[in-house]
Swiss-Prot record:
The modification Phosphoserine is found at residue 9. Belongs to the SFT2 family. This is Vesicle transport protein SFT2B. It comes from Rattus norvegicus (Rat). Keywords: Acetylation, Membrane, Phosphoprotein, Protein transport, Transmembrane, Transmembrane helix, Transport.
Amino acid sequence: MDKLKKVLSGQDTEDRSGLSEVVESSSLSWSTRIKGFIVCFALGILCSLLGTLLLWVSRKGLFAVFYTLGNITSIGSTMFLMGPLKQLKRMFEPTRLIATILVLLFFVLTLCSAFLWNKGLALIFCILQSLALTWYSLSYIPYARDAVKKCFAVCLT
């Protein structure tokens, strides 16, 4: 567990100055941070699903508000794991670059399809964006992606 804390907080790879340590530190315990991540991520997905259900309501603004709120909450949930500044720095690292781009791309495509194109296409983009967001979030937990890959490999064989 200590190794996981060090990897997520960057203590084993970074030499931090006093000011950056104060700015990036968190007073939350490790278990509270994990619980905060799980709760925020689940609430974000719930808001996104509610927004998706509101896609077929004639007022498209409801869809946009709930879906946007859900995605911001889900992406923000990873800030519990390492802090906001470090997360923003790590969003575009090679290990999660594709997932970050896909999340942002599907978010834009979902809103464009809801307002300009087809609601069915918007639903497909909602599903794809949720999958990309999950993959992005798993990149912050060491070996979580490998575990998911192995689980799916076992299920598919």
